[in-house]
Amino acid sequence: FLSLIPGAISAIASLFK
């Protein structure tokens, strides 16, 4: 589960860019 968080943050960060 913890390894899944970075991927989610990356996707969300790309949306804000």
From Swiss-Prot:
UniProt keyword annotations, A-Z: Amidation, Antimicrobial, Antiviral protein, Secreted
Primary site of residence: secreted
Cell compartments where the protein resides: Secreted
Free-text tissue specificity from the UniProt record: Expressed by the venom gland.
GO biological process, one term: regulation of defense response to virus
KW Secreted (keyword) present: yes
Domain of life: Eukaryota
Residues annotated with Lysine amide modification: 17
One Gene Ontology cellular component annotation held by this UniProt entry: extracellular region
Note: Inhibits hepatitis B virus replication in the HepG2.2.15 cell line by about 40%.
Family per similarity comment: Belongs to the non-disulfide-bridged peptide (NDBP) superfamily. Short antimicrobial peptide (group 4) family.
Name of the protein in question: Peptide Ctry2801
Lineage per the UniProt record: Eukaryota, Metazoa, Ecdysozoa, Arthropoda, Chelicerata
